[in-house]
């Protein structure tokens, strides 16, 4: 009974990771490659610029490749706590920059979709990657919730500091 439960839990985690990871990777491919109606990297860089981000070229690369490579790594359960933290941050930034103030529902541009993806990333970041993961197949040591939290905090602080500098620069530009 216990063995069946563990196998079922590991399989369920893996299936959720594959589905959500591929959805996130597809969004990254839109941003990087311009496929499936996406803007491509040049168009995404313009979008990041319109969002008022400081160093828009840098953040366009970070965000798009976080989604593309991170989504694939997430699907396979590779370096899971690190990747899950990066994806959690990415979805938080998407909410803050593009969806906040538009309500909850995705149909009106709200936070529903990135919130759900971020929640799944966060849950997997604090969970053991399970038997059906590249981490386990490669014999990588369990990194645990501590690694997830450290990456989450460091990445969030980097984003907040960048945002603060961007907001301060915008104030100076408006005053000039």
For each of these PLM feature ranges, what is it?
Residues 1-35, 57, 79-176:
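Extended, low-polarity transmembrane helix blocks
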Residues 34-62:
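Membrane-interface interhelical connector segments
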Residues 41, 54, 73-75, 118-119:
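Alpha-helix boundary/capping detector
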Residues 45, 69-72, 86-89:
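A general structural signal for well-ordered alpha-helical packing
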Residues 46-47, 66, 110:
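Residue-level signal for alpha-helical context at structural boundaries
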Residues 59-66, 86:
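Physicochemical signature of membrane-embedded alpha-helices that form the seven-helix bundle of GPCRs
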Residues 65-74, 98-99:
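Hydrophobic, membrane-inserted alpha-helices
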